[in-house]
Amino acid sequence: GYGQTAPYKDRAGHDINYLALAGVASHTGRQDTGPLPLGVQLADVAGGSLHAVVGLLAAVIARQQSGVGQYLDVSMTDCSFSLNAMAGAGYLACGVEPGWENHVLNGGSFYDYYRTRDGRWMSVGSLEPGFMQQLCAALGRPELAAHSVTPERQAVLKQALQVEFEKRSFDQLCELFAGVDACVEPVLSLSEAVEHPQLKARELVSQVPRGDGSTQAQLACPLKFSEGLPAPRHIGVAVGAHSDEVLVALGFGVERIEQLRQAKVVG
């Protein structure tokens, strides 16, 4: 979590801790509620795992060129810190301290989520003028587009947009923006996302053989290769399926293994 060196190298931690220490949580939240507990393991996956893959591939290429292998030290905290791309650049170059809802991408502008009449949510990312004009025209408020270029008018603009979104239901807004290229999309539940035509067409759920003739739905590999897509061949085996083989290899006899099973030490 914290790397192989420095004072925290042996310290315990989890995703939420790495994001906190890396400064990410200090500008990912709301002014009235503070930092948001994310439902995605950002530090673990986007921070640690993906950076580890990049590092491993870079080391393989370096070995091919130099013949020398490397030891890779990947810290989820280090990698989370590097995710402060725009906010970090603003602070290091200009001394601008990022905070909750104080810059374009974290709620400090109209780039945000808006509640619908029936309590659902829509995402609005219409940053560019063309997209903003499409957004305002679709809502029947073309005059609002002029406010998007002035930082001091952001609060007024957000309030006006919220009023317009709350006039309509979630389904009405989905239908309204289905044919409008304005960077406006619905906030879907996971069950809705699984059934969305875009995600279904991208084959993001795979059916993996169980070994008994049935299949198990799992998240598919999101990478698309020109020469075919890696496919999982099985879902694994049940816990305890190889207990006997493991115990025999460790020197346990048949009678002792049965005793352990009766005592529910092993499955």
Model-derived regions, located:
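Flexible, small-/acidic-enriched active-site or ligand-binding loops
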Residues: 151, 210-261
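Residue-level signal for nonpolar/aromatic packing positions in well-ordered secondary structure
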Residues: 15, 56, 67, 135, ...
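Aromatic-enriched alpha-helical interface/lid elements that frame and gate functional surfaces
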Residues: 105, 110-184
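Active-site-adjacent "lid/gating" segments in soluble enzymes
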Residues: 1-122, 126-127
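Alpha-helical scaffold segments in soluble metabolic enzymes
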Residues: 51-59, 87, 134-138, 160, ...
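Short linear loop/turn motifs
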Residues: 146-161, 188-195, 256-267
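A glycine-rich dinucleotide-binding beta-alpha-beta segment and adjacent secondary-structure elements
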Residues: 179-233
